[in-house]
Amino acid sequence: MDLVIRNGRSEHGQPIELGITAGVITAVSSPNTLPPAAQEIDAQGGMISPAFIESHFHLENALLWDGLINQSGTLEEAIEIYAKVKHDLTVEDIVARAGMVVKTAVANGTLWLRSHVDIDHIARLSILRGVAAAREAYRDLIDIQLVAFPQLGLAQNPEAVEMMWQAMENGCDLVGGMPHGEKTMDDAAKHIDIAFEIAQKYDVDIDMHIDETDDPYWHSLELLADKTVETGWQGRVTAGHCCAMSAWDDKMAARIIDKVKAADIHIITNAPINSMLEGRHSGYPKPRGIARVKELLEAGVNVVCGQDDLQNMFYPFGKMDPLEVALITAHLAHLGAPHEIEAAFNMPRYHAARMWGLYNYGVFVGAAANLVILEAETAVQALRQQPANRTVIRNGRVLTERKAETIWHMSN
């Protein structure tokens, strides 16, 4: 064996040790049973978890904060600010900022990242070139997927449609969309139709920003579900945000959730950013624009959580830590029972792996050795304590170790 991890625990608290050979888990054993290896790690009683997955992010505008302050705090102003500066972004700048993000993410235990890339008549393919260069630059640290994201619309923008086709020829892995950015539901339907046409041509999955508003008028999620079933794209479609769901009445929400389940659509909730952006136009009681996470989970829908933005005009905070995102999601979605906390913990892990189609993901013999060791014994502890100490392993190779220490300067 190349690597043995001793004195660890499974995510349910059982003492275990792992053997890894050629980047694959080849043994999951009870303590003190595996032979010596070329390299050994003492997990010190920590949980051996599969590494985290960041499923909804925007690499190109991460860390764009200085001088670009969103005074109103609204999504609309954030989009306006970004539209004014996106044409000035260089490949070198995007790669440099992406590197800071990637290194932070990896040190926190994230080994997969899906980034939406703005494709429009302003930036054309310049941003894609930058993010694609970043993907190549950091390929030894993290797997990055790129989503062609037409934030400024498709239905009335033939140039953007052409750019989307070109984006798929120039490195994008998935087709994105933002149908609620159109002016009417009819145009939203056209937007969705265009996205599916492109996805079917290239036989790729779809990941759209859906109903990122607290206006109950918007229900493009329903259109997306209908189109998914119509085209046979079940299991291959993801809907991010879904904020308007919180403004629908219960009957409407239940009907559309049933359609989402039937279409096997994955839902990504971006609780930190949407709780910051939504409700800005309302008095009290003030909506917070969070998808109905609990109802979706109860219906059997696969729910994932995502960071979305980091220290920019859309969101001034964030640590690129899926544990923080899961904790905030648990708060805002009222996930407080033990099984609900476990569901929140699984959102950037097993739920995300299902969305990505990572079938060799986990801690079992034959799985790829992509792991994070956490100073916690259970899901509840992981979310409560947000442990700083973490060891990150990619394909059987130790990438990072973080060891924080508290020093007491008191006699007792």
Residue ranges of model-derived segments:
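Active-site gating loops and adjacent loop-to-helix segments of metal-dependent hydrolytic enzymes
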Residues: 62-94, 171-174, 202, 220-238, ...
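Divalent metal-coordination and catalytic microenvironments
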Residues: 8, 23, 45, 56, ...
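His/Asp/Glu-enriched, well-ordered alpha-helical/loop segment
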Residues: 205, 226-237, 273, 277, ...
